[in-house]
Each structure stands twice: as C-alpha cells, then as structure tokens.
Amino acid sequence: MSARPQISFVVPAYNEEVLLPACLNAIRAEVARTGCDAEILVVNNASTDRTAEVAEAIPGVTVVHEPIKGLVSARRCGFEAARGVLIANIDADTKVPPYWLDRVLESFAADPKLVALSGPYDYYDVPLHIRLFSRAFYAMGYLTYAFNKHVLGVGSMVQGGNFIVLRDALAEAGGFSDTFQFYGEDTDIARRMNQVGNVTFTWKLMAQSSGRRLRGDGVVMTGIRYSANYLWATFFRKPFTDAWHDYR
C-alpha cells in the first residue's frame, strides 16, 4: 500500500446530484493549485437520485457507499475509508474557496498540538440580510464558545460541514458517536477532540455553503435549534433535537 495521503476529503452525500459537482470541483481546484497529496471520497448515503453516478464521473473522486441513511453514519463510513493523515469533512452543498487548503496545512504545521480546525459558513444563495444575520449568529456563537472553553473549561466548536481533524486524534477520541445523528454531532466531536489536543475555530477558514436550511426552517428557528443543540451537546452530551428535515 502506498504512503498515506496528506489529507483526505470526505463528502457525505444524500441526493446531492445538483450541488455535488460544484463542491467536488472546488476541492479539486485547491488540490491542483497546492499540489497537495490528497484523496477525495464521496460517501453515497442511500441516495435515490444520480449522486453516485455524478461523483464517479468526476476525475480523482472515489465513491464509497453507506446504506444506512444518516449524517453520522456517512461521516463514519468516510472516516473508515479515508487514509489521510488529516481528514477534511466537507458537506456536499459547500465550496471551499481559493487558499482554503493553504490555511489548513499551515495551521497544522504551525501547531503540533492542533487536532481539529474549523471555520464558519458564508451562505452564497440567500439575501444579504440573511447573510448578515448568520454572521451575527456566528459572532454570538464564537463568544459562547470562547467563554465555555476558556472560562468554564468545557467543550469547543466546529462547523460540521467545514472542519478538519487529525485522523489518529479522532480515533483516540472515539470517532463518531451514535448518540448524535444530525444536530449536535459537530459539537460532540469538538468536545471530545478538545480532550486530546487543541481545537481551533477561526474566521480565516470560511467556506461557502447553501442556505437551503435557513430558507426551509426559517432563520430564527434555525438559530434556536443550533444554539439549543450546541448547549445540550456541550453540557448534557446528547442532542436537544432528534429529528431533522433533508432540504434539497
């Protein structure tokens, strides 16, 4: 077997034939620009559309299949298939911008204790007022994260579809937990990763993502749900909300 890639990109995908190509091509552009040794994995998560065929048609992409539908099941499948020293978890409706990969590699090279790195979303397909609201929400979330981490000494923060982990550190932290199936899964990872090394959330690692959940659930309700699940995952180690809707 060849040496481990420097980074594995894992993209869970359930019925994502429309948005998936833009996600994968953005990743491919970053890999090509940097010359980084990387692999790109799409986890076809029980899709009923052409997700698998679309992914297989893109050069350099490997498709693995997870028949049990659910975000955490898909992330775990990708984690088990990935060979990279680092694993970048990118959602199928998300696009990494130019120089995103530089910031990732530089951050891990600069801090030998860094085990997880993440940044916020910039929602590219919603009106300006919703984008501004989301940035204000992230700002409040960041203050809560900083207080919990540096004052109370509990938990940390990552954005589920835009985070990178040191593979061996995630294995040491126990991998992905079945306690969380959607809401709170990223906070749970951040909390456990924080026990084995440094977890950093930075505005310098912003990624572009679809605001389809903001449109579907409403901005206020989305904010309430994510806030409640962040607190429940941090302090009670379980989700506040078990059900979710797939917006496509």
Residue ranges and their predicted role:
Residues E16-V31:
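Short, well-formed alpha-helical segments that are part of the catalytic scaffolds
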Residues I87:
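Short aromatic/hydrophobic "clamp" motif used to bind/position activated sugar donors
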